[in-house]
């Protein structure tokens, strides 16, 4: 493949609901431009994008795939970097990485299915990253699909920016062509995406007039000259219309709507023309970073004449082909066999060959210029989000904003001794997927696997088995309770072993009461008079309290919020020791704790649930069933409701799946640990009974 400069490049991300036709669209574009000799099918497992075994087995995209294609546009050959993303929400991290380096988006919508949750999420992502967008309507070959109804729904949902650039032509209820609204011309498909001119059907004239007038109004708003010409009834030329519309598409005030049929490979040459004529080159945008040498803001304008800087947006780690770091060149030119400086890691690395990735295939290239996307193999320390530059010109760019994982499961190896293998394999998978996280929960003696959703975790388990030949089981995690007391108690702890010879003797009288501070295990004080307990044994008594707080007497959970006061005791001049007084204090703690109305505390989370208004009743009802307390509700800038609530952490298990079910997938949530609160009696009873064997081990 040739080397292309910034003005000849388009970086376009394919977004949309799962199953809408993104991968088929990418496949058709590759086929039409000659990048492939035949068009693969998802059902046959031979598409460019979905090459991973898990994707072939499940027949949907799991990872973002890069598909560079070449196309002869109006100004000569150009390169289009297609980023085909997953549509299922569990893999949103892949989508966010792709969107962060795209300069425009194609939102793929299935005409029959209409606006789906994935359509709305795609639109929100484009808004968040300020991406120009085109809507490409697929499945036009389905005679039950109504393009007109879909456009009306799009206008109602997304506003006046929706602009049909085409209207369908049907004969005998079959999709055979379209009307080009910009050029006011009919197009009939001949062979696949090829077409010939044809008459505009009479039934299209009314809708054509409406669509055409809307486009001309947008053209008129571009300048005062155009506005005057519009009101005087003067016609615009096609090139004037295209130039004006391009400005509106780039600033997002117009969203072209196009159409096609993936199964028949129709409409894709027109889509390529729109990418060429209306979507921006990388230099229409800026990449903001910091000049490390000065600490000042740095603005990259995709100029290949200045020093090199690039941002790594994705990492592929494959046991067979190795590690590839995918990056977008922000400034300068990256050349093979050169030395780069990883600004985040403050270290230099050697670059070997440079590649373009087309699905699983690698294409070697002599250089990568600003605005382009490519890959470098076998970088040692470089990870997703890192900036590479030259040591003499260190620039660092902001890392991509990736969704935080809130779903987690406990995992353990099926085969004893595989722990290190699993840990190594997960490290590789976490390099690829920033929404995947492994946590060693030492308190509960469990390993936790975090992700966006259950489906993602299921795929991870399958990858561990198929890629790395290690097997793990997922199960419900344990939750970290705490123990405390609700009233005051006064007890004695006496440890005495005097059966001849040097013995052991320690005697303490102590008070235990709530400290009022659940953020610390205990507060220790002493009020001993007359030397009943020598001062040199006070630290041993406190140590006994501290060790007792590690595993409480009620259910072997850590103790919090206890005030322990040493008030009296006795000692033996020969047999007393630090060990004896520590043991006596532990005996006193256990007895005093159990006499002070002990209770279990459960972890409480501060939860925010974001849903459209129509789902608020169901969501709040469900939160009440989960023992949640709704604190309030506010609207956000997307017109959705944000419900705030306190809820026990244990009740959030499985919440991701249930929330999606309640809201059709549109609902999202986030939470953070807030505090501990007393658990209901039935919860306490169950925990105490289940952990009785652990408490018995505390006997002294």
Give residue ranges: language-model regions.
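Structural and coupling elements of P-loop NTPases
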Residues: 1-700
């Amino acid at each position: 493949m040739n080397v292309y400069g910034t003005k000849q490049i388009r970086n376009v991300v394919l977004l949309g609901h799962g199953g809408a036709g993104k991968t088929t669209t990418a496949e058709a574009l590759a086929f039409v431009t000659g990048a492939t000799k035949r068009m693969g099918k998802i059902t046959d497992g031979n598409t460019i994008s979905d090459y991973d075994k898990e994707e072939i087995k499940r027949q949907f995209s799991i990872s973002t795939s890069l598909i560079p294609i070449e196309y002869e546009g109006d100004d000569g050959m150009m390169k289009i970097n297609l980023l085909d993303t997953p549509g299922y929400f569990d893999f949103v991290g892949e989508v966010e990485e792709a969107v962060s380096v795209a300069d425009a988006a194609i939102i793929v919508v299935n005409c029959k299915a209409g606006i789906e949750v994935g359509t709305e999420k795609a639109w929100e992502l484009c808004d968040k990253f300020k991406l120009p967008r085109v809507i490409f309507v697929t499945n036009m070959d389905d005679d039950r699909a109504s393009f007109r109804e879909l456009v009306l729904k799009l206008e109602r949902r997304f506003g006046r920016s929706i602009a049909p650039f085409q209207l369908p032509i049907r004969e005998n209820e079959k999709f055979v062509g379209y009307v080009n609204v910009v050029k006011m011309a009919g197009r009939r498909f001949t062979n696949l995406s090829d077409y010939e001119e044809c008459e505009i059907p009479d039934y299209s004239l009314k809708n054509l007039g409406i669509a055409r007038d809307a486009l001309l109004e947008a053209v008129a708003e571009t300048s005062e000259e155009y506005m005057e010409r519009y009101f005087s009834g003067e016609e615009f030329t096609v090139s004037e219309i295209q130039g004006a519309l391009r400005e509106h598409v780039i600033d997002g005030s117009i969203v072209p709507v196009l159409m096609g049929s993936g199964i028949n490979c129709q409409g894709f040459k027109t889509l390529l023309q729109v990418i060429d004529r209306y979507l921006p080159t990388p230099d229409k945008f800026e990449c903001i970073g910091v000049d490390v040498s000065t600490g000042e803001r740095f603005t990259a304008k995709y100029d290949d004449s200045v020093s090199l800087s690039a941002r790594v947006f994705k990492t592929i780690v494959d046991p067979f082909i190795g590690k590839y770091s995918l990056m977008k060149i922000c400034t300068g030119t990256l050349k093979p066999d050169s030395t780069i400086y990883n600004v985040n890691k403050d270290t230099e690395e050697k670059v070997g060959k440079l590649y373009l990735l087309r699905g699983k295939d690698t294409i070697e290239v002599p250089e990568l210029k600003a605005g382009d996307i490519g890959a470098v193999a076998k970088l040692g320390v470089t990870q997703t989000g890192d900036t590479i530059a030259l040591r003499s010109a260190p620039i660092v760019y902001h890392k991509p904003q990736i969704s935080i994982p809130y779903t987690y499961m406990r995992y353990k190896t099926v085969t004893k001794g595989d722990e290190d293998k699993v840990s190594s394999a997960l490290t590789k998978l976490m390099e690829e997927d920033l929404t995947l996280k492994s946590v060693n929960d030492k308190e509960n003696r469990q390993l936790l696997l975090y992700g966006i959703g259950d489906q993602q975790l299921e795929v991870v388990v399958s990858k561990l088995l198929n890629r790395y030949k290690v097997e793990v089981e997922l199960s419900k995690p344990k939750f970290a309770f705490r123990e405390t007391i609700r009233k005051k108690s006064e007890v004695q702890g006496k440890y005495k072993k005097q059966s001849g010879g040097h013995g052991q003797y320690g005697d303490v009288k102590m008070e235990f009461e709530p400290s009022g501070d659940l953020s610390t295990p205990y507060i220790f004080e002493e009020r001993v008079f007359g030397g009943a307990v020598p001062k040199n044994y006070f630290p041993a008594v406190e140590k006994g309290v501290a060790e007792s707080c590690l595993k409480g007497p009620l259910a072997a959970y850590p103790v919090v919020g206890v005030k322990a006061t040493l008030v009296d005791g006795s000692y033996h001049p020969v047999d007393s020791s630090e060990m004896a007084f520590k043991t006596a204090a532990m005996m006193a703690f256990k007895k005093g704790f159990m006499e002070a109305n002990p209770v279990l505390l459960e972890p409480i989370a501060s939860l925010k649930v974001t849903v459209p208004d129509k789902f608020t009743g169901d969501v709040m009802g469900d939160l009440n069933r989960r023992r949640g307390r709704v604190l309030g509700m506010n609207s956000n800038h997307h017109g959705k409701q944000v419900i705030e609530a306190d809820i026990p952490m244990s009740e959030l298990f499985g919440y991701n799946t249930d929330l999606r079910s309640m809201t059709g997938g549109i609902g999202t949530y986030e939470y953070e640990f807030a505090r501990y609160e007393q658990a209901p009696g039935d919860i306490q009873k169950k925990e105490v009974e289940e952990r009785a064997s652990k408490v018995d081990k505390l006997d002294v």
